[in-house]
């Protein structure tokens, strides 16, 4: 039983490293203007995470459009705005498919 647990921990660590490498490649390709290759890297990273049954890293999850799967580069193919109407939040708009992602901002309670 210990061997299996050790093997799973090691394979999850390898999967995290591969996802990180793929997302860095996706960022590089997206900056160079090769959006289709960037989407392929994102899909590969998602497949690895699903196969290993592990959550996608939060720092990368927010850089991917949930609707079209493109890698978001703020200012190039994504727009970022802060709003404070009902509750303070950040609005990220994908400029390729016009989907909106809202991320709440935690405020201090007085």
From Swiss-Prot:
Its cofactor is Zn(2+). Binds 1 zinc ion per subunit. It catalyses: Endonucleolytic cleavage of RNA, removing 5'-extranucleotides from tRNA precursor. Keywords: Cytoplasm, Endonuclease, Hydrolase, Metal-binding, Nuclease, tRNA processing, Zinc. Part of ribonuclease P, a protein complex that generates mature tRNA molecules by cleaving their 5'-ends. HAMAP family: RNase_P_4 (MF_00757). This is Ribonuclease P protein component 4.
